Amino acid sequence: MQYDVARIREDFPILSRDVYGKPLVYLDNGATTQKPRCVVDAIVNEYYSVNANVHRGVHFLSQQATELHEAARETVRRFINARSTREIVFTRGTTESINLVASSFVAGQMKPGDEVIVSQMEHHSNIVPWQLQAERSGIVIRVIPIDDRGELMEDALEQLFTPRTKLVSVAHVSNVLGTVNPVERIVARAHAHGVPVLVDGAQAVPHQPVDVQKLDADFYVFSGHKVYGPTGIGVLYGKEEWLDRLPPYQGGGEMIHTVSFSGTTFAELPLKFEAGTPDYVGTTALARALDYVSTIGMDRIAAYEHELTQYAKFRICISSEIRRIGKVSFLSRSVIFTRWIWVLYSTG
């Protein structure tokens, strides 16, 4: 079936507007994506027709809202091929997901002097949470270097493992360089040392199929707004055995089972990590976004982006006015434009 770009553009109302007298061309999807009409409609419909708190009431609207919320969790599970909805935790986004793991993992699994490995190409949301934990808990951050092609130096990674290495946290796709990291190999290397892996999938999920069981990552995180969903909603996938072992990140609301002044018991997974009233409208809209791209086909999206990437690279390479950064022949990248004159090869 043909990839009908014109038809797909019609699904995005904002793309029908003019900017400075010309049709809008939007290239900032690495920061946030525009929203198809079906996602906006899902938000409006829930507020107009279903709005009620979830997991809290026995009345009709609450039950209906809860069903939509948990159906969204199942949609996410299916989209990334997790084993169980118990492994799908809703958060505010990739940044909060990483902070959740950093806080709970350090509290439950690390001691002063223990080490976490990150890469030199990480987004600051996968650097600063670990720096905060280093200041508070005395853990040590070790960094995987990159070479002049913008790729991880895997041999150097191997040398970073020590008996005190407790976690590797690495991007699936770099938001700056666009490098698609060999996550399966990284996970296999880490697991050979008995070390779990967190993968930042914020820039991967919108562009390629993601199968968390195939990757074998212990944690995988992404944001809804980068995959045509609403802002303020994100996902933490965690293997059930790891989520069971970690302490809660925040307290109150959804995450409690019983409360008394003598002690509190916590809800079962995944609610154990979902304190407060969840963004149940956001989860429904996220599910609609994932259904939307699934209907188009993630394989077809990836193939079309590859065609665009190859054409863009060709045009860039014959231009004498554009500075190129990155390995031109590296086919697993597309193009990032920065200030219109600097070009980085990436998957963004």
Residue ranges and their predicted role:
Residues 1-348:
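Pyridoxal 5′-phosphate
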